[in-house]
């Protein structure tokens, strides 16, 4: 079978579902999400502490948050990446709330902010001590109720489709790689289907399950990074920073 979409998202955690909702609600086209197990099985639901974001501007600001993050990372962190994540955090929190995620609030309606290790101010938004599960719940409900998002549960992305699969020769010296979608295994038919898309996004998370001792679910196998590596024929940048056995 051949399926055609505007957006193909491989992975069903907070990254994959957030991207799906953003493009679908902006009416940018038809979206398909590929989940290798069920939609609710992702590392997102295991996160407990909370989400850091500058919200109380009376005592906090972006510069403080950036500085705290750089210190916590022993100044190894990419400054521009840290700055982007910190400054965009309030907007992302607003989006999560609009999609139905509930964060704990005080009696006056303001967020009940906590402070965790490395933070100089109270800026941790949370939902009791199961913040990840609440984010996963809210996003799943929003995704399932969105008519422009098709969800393929228990489907496994086998390979990214590039010009190599169309007969072109691809090597490490090839200046760029075109992506046309992915080959996906359908467990019901035991056949590999073709999913063509204008945009393909890989949101498959870390590789904690390859270690003997880990708190990660068994699906965290890092196969998404492997698919990208095979497709582009290049070494992945910052592989040592990849989430692993936390």
Mark where each language-model region is.
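Positively charged, low-complexity/disordered segments
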Residues: 229-246
């Amino acid at each position: 079978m051949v399926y055609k979409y505007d957006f193909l998202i491989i992975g069903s955690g907070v990254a994959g579902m957030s991207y799906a909702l953003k493009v679908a609600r902006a009416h940018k086209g038809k979206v398909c999400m590929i989940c290798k197990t069920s939609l609710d099985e992702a590392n997102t639901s295991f996160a407990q502490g909370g989400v850091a974001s500058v919200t109380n501007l009376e005592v906090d600001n972006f510069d403080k948050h950036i500085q705290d993050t750089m210190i916590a990372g022993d100044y190894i962190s990419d400054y521009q990446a840290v700055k982007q994540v910190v400054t965009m955090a309030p907007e992302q929190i607003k989006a999560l709330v609009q999609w139905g995620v509930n964060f704990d609030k005080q009696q006056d309606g303001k967020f009940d902010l906590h402070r965790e290790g490395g933070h100089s101010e109270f800026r941790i938004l949370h939902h009791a001590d199961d913040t990840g599960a609440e984010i996963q719940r809210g996003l799943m409900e929003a995704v399932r109720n969105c008519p422009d998002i098709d969800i393929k549960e228990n489907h496994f992305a086998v390979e990214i489709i590039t010009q190599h699969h169309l007969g072109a020769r691809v090597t490490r010296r090839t200046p760029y790689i075109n992506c046309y979608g992915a080959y996906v295994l359908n467990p019901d038919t035991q056949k590999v289907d073709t999913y063509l898309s204008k945009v393909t996004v890989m949101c498959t998370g870390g590789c904690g399950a390859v270690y003997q001792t880990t708190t990660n679910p068994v699906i965290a196998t890092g196969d998404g990074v492997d698919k990208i590596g095979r497709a582009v024929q290049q070494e992945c940048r910052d592989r040592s920073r990849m989430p692993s056995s936390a």
